[in-house]
């Protein structure tokens, strides 16, 4: 009986100090893409295929990553008007394709 109680205590202690990474969902451990520099040039909407927003707290800046029709990814500042206009254009294009 003493052996099983000691074993139970040992298991509880081991569980308390075990790494929490094993209990986290896969998305938390997924790599994060961050933008450290933004393009200085406006990109023509005809060259853009899609975009995604980067809002992770692990990144130093919020950003938009545009993907061009030749699969190149370009970081842009979401505060700039041309970036917002390009996102709106791509959103409308996507909605048109869905309907």
UniProtKB/Swiss-Prot annotation:
Residue ranges of the TM segments: none
Family membership: Belongs to the intercrine beta (chemokine CC) family.
Residues annotated as glycosylated: 37
PANTHER family noted in UniProt: C-C MOTIF CHEMOKINE 2, SMALL INDUCIBLE CYTOKINE A
Single Gene Ontology MF annotation: chemokine activity
Keywords for this protein: Chemotaxis, Cytokine, Disulfide bond, Glycoprotein, Inflammatory response, Pyrrolidone carboxylic acid, Secreted, Signal
Subunit structure: Monomer or homodimer; in equilibrium. Is tethered on endothelial cells by glycosaminoglycan (GAG) side chains of proteoglycans. Interacts with TNFAIP6 (via Link domain).
Post-translational modification: Processing at the N-terminus can regulate receptor and target cell selectivity. Deletion of the N-terminal residue converts it from an activator of basophil to an eosinophil chemoattractant. N-Glycosylated.
Classification via InterPro entries: Chemokine_b/g/d (IPR039809), Chemokine_CC_CS (IPR000827), Chemokine_IL8-like_dom (IPR001811), Interleukin_8-like_sf (IPR036048)
Keyword Metal-binding: no
Entry protein name: C-C motif chemokine 2
Disulfide bridges in this chain: 34-59, 35-75
Signal peptide: 1-23
Free-text function comment from the UniProt entry: Acts as a ligand for C-C chemokine receptor CCR2. Signals through binding and activation of CCR2 and induces a strong chemotactic response and mobilization of intracellular calcium ions. Exhibits a chemotactic activity for monocytes and basophils but not neutrophils or eosinophils. Plays an important role in mediating peripheral nerve injury-induced neuropathic pain. Increases NMDA-mediated synaptic transmission in both dopamine D1 and D2 receptor-containing neurons, which may be caused by MAPK/ERK-dependent phosphorylation of GRIN2B/NMDAR2B.
Underlying gene: CCL2
Sites of Pyrrolidone carboxylic acid modification: 24
Primary subcellular site in the record, as a coarse category: secreted
GO BP term, pick one: antimicrobial humoral immune response mediated by antimicrobial peptide
């Amino acid at each position: 009986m003493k052996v099983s109680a000691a074993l139970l205590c040992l298991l509880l202690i081991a569980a308390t100090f075990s790494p929490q990474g094993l209990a986290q969902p896969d998305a938390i451990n997924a790599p994060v893409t961050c933008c450290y520099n933004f393009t200085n040039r406006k990109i023509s909407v005809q060259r853009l295929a899609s975009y995604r927003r980067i809002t992770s707290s692990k990144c130093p800046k919020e950003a938009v990553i545009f993907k061009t029709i030749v699969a190149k990814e370009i970081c842009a500042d979401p505060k700039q008007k041309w970036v917002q206009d390009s996102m709106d254009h791509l959103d409308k294009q996507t909605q048109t394709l869905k309907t």
